[in-house]
Amino acid sequence: MAAKGAPVFPPQHGAWAFLGLPIILGAMVGGVTPLSVLLGIGFIVAYPASYFAIAILRYPRPQRFRKGLWIWGSTGAVIAVLLIAARPWLLWVGLVYAIAFAVNLAFARAHNERSLLNDAVFILECVAIVPIMWAINAGTTDLVPPPFVDAPTTLWTLTAFAALALVGSTMHVRSLIRERSNPRFRMLSQVFAGVSLITSVALAYPYGMWALLCTAVAFGFLLVRSLLLGRRPMKPG
């Protein structure tokens, strides 16, 4: 029986943006269908399920986290079955994500889940959902996914946007907290934000003025945030 007051939501609220951005970008190129909506929901549900699975291994009184794992894990399992029934090739995707999650678990067991390498694995897990959102609407109903060589160039542009934004945000947050006493890392974060702005604008240029403007505003904001907030590093607690 779960302990009284057992949490059912992860406390890391910033992670939700990491989940939402790739889903939105994937829907922009792949379209919104019942299957893509179900995939998006399943991807979001997987995060709290994985959080509580790690928490059971990581923290004292693991019974506190069993309720959250049951709620999110069972919901995610139902969604996974429905998705695999509709797109059997998602079974291979699930296996790849299981391997990636095993890496997350290994870092958690070593009490090193905040390492840069573990962050990189989480970013890859998030960014990969962009092409998967496209593929799920491509109509393939067997064990072989649709050929990604047939995907529009827009897909890879938006995937690159997701990668740049998530890597930059991860570096920015680390520069404010875990690396707050490391001016070199803070400068590296700011340089990456500047390079991301230039790269994203170059990628958006072929798609017209509106795409160029939206991209410049989005990545320009990330650069300004890095420069302004980077002056006063935060202190934990």
Predicted segments with their positions:
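Small-residue-rich segments of transmembrane alpha-helices in multi-pass membrane proteins
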Residues: 20-23, 68-78, 120-135, 187-200, ...
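Helix-coil boundary and interhelical linker segments in multi-pass alpha-helical membrane proteins
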Residues: 24-39, 80-92, 128-158, 199-212
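Alpha-helical transmembrane segments and their membrane-interface exit regions
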Residues: 42-52, 98-108, 126-128, 161-172, ...
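N-terminal topogenic module of multi-pass integral membrane proteins
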Residues: 1-94
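Glycine/small-residue-rich hydrophobic helix-like segments
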Residues: 186-237
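Interhelical loop and helix-boundary elements at the membrane-water interface
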Residues: 1-16, 60-68, 105-124, 176-192, ...
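Long hydrophobic alpha-helical segments that form multi-pass transmembrane helix bundles
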Residues: 124-193
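Hydrophobic alpha-helical segments and helix pairs
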Residues: 78-133
